[in-house]
């Protein structure tokens, strides 16, 4: 592949990555505490969309804080996994073969 062709392919890949990032803003990921008293929804780009807290948790600030930390960490981990998997797939699919760069996305 010539240099101009590679540059064109890289621009195409960049656009596909940007399109994927926009699409990931619409992918919702849910997580809840083990007992279902706290529910959090984020996008695959790790933006919090909603938090639902059962009234019983409002009586114990420390417990609520613990629930928030644990549940937020879980949902962010899930979102990060989806995000990385989707962006990696786009990059792998469209990256031109550049000598010496074979292991870049492994």
Swiss-Prot record:
Q: Name one GO cellular component term.
A: cytoplasm
InterPro entries linked:
YbaB-like_sf, YbaB/EbfC
Keyword Transmembrane in the entry? The reply is: no
Q: Which Gene3D superfamilies match?
A: Nucleoid-associated protein YbaB-like domain
- Domain of life (superkingdom): Bacteria
A molecular function annotated in GO for this UniProt entry is: DNA binding
Q: Where does it reside? A: Cytoplasm, Nucleoid
Supply the alphabetized keyword list: Cytoplasm, DNA-binding
Q: What does this protein do?
A: Binds to DNA and alters its conformation. May be involved in regulation of gene expression, nucleoid organization and DNA protection.
Q: Which HAMAP family does the annotation name?
A: DNA_YbaB_EbfC
**Similarity remark:** Belongs to the YbaB/EbfC family.
Alphabetical list of NCBIfam families matching this protein = DNA_YbaB_EbfC (TIGR00103)
Subunit info here reads:
Homodimer.
Tell me what this protein is called.
Nucleoid-associated protein Fjoh_2555
Q: What organism is listed for this UniProt entry?
A: Flavobacterium johnsoniae (strain ATCC 17061 / DSM 2064 / JCM 8514 / BCRC 14874 / CCUG 350202 / NBRC 14942 / NCIMB 11054 / UW101) (Cytophaga johnsonae)
Taxon lineage: Bacteria, Pseudomonadati, Bacteroidota, Flavobacteriia, Flavobacteriales
């Amino acid at each position: 592949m010539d240099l101009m062709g590679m540059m064109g392919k890289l621009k195409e890949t960049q656009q596909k990555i940007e399109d994927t990032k926009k699409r990931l803003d619409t992918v919702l990921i849910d997580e809840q505490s083990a007992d279902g008293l706290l529910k959090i929804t984020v996008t695959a780009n790790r933006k919090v969309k909603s938090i639902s807290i059962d009234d019983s948790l409002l009586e114990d600030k420390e417990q609520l804080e613990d629930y928030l930390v644990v549940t937020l960490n879980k949902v962010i981990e899930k979102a990060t996994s989806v995000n990385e998997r989707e962006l990696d797939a786009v990059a792998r699919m469209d990256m031109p073969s550049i000598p010496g760069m074979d292991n870049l996305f492994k």
